[in-house]
Amino acid sequence: MKHLLTFALTLFAVVAIAQNPVLGKWKTIDDETGRIKSVVEITERNGKIYGQVIELFRLPDEDQNPICDECEDDRKDQPALGMEIVRDMVPVAGALEWEDGTICDPKNGKIYDCEMWLEEGNMDELKVRGYIFFLFRTQTWLRQK
């Protein structure tokens, strides 16, 4: 019985370590107002990370179902709700970082190179940086619990 318990605990620990810590639901925060803008669900497909908007938090006077009419790729004229805004993020070996992907701003249709990272000891704040050349903006997304 003792061996079975030890085996079960070891298996649980291995599975917990193997799970990608970035996966899950993250609240995006408006840089200017501090309000929650949306919830993005981060998933993994074929070893890459993707993020889809699964919930929007809009003020009563705002369009409740905005579309990306400024997008120029397959997201053109698609609703922001349900849109895949993060694509093709690749994990950095040995780090809590993902890079070489893109992020789309559905408000203006612009697509930016993207990198994301979790800081050791704080798995509930995801740093998301969109950039073009040397210009960048970093947001902190909060894990939805």
Indicate residue ranges for each PLM-predicted region.
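C-terminal terminal-subdomain/extension
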Residues: 113-117, 123-125
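Central antiparallel beta-sheet cores of small beta-barrel/beta-sandwich binding domains
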Residues: 30, 35-113
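Short aromatic-glycine motifs in intrinsically disordered, low-complexity regions
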Residues: 71-77, 126-133
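Edge beta-strand at a domain terminus
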Residues: 123, 129-145
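General beta-strand recognition
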Residues: 27, 50-52, 98, 125-127, ...
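Hydrophobic h-region of N-terminal signal peptides that target proteins for export
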Residues: 9-18
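Positively charged n-region of N-terminal signal peptides that target proteins for export
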Residues: 1-4
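Cleaved targeting-peptide boundary
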Residues: 19-26
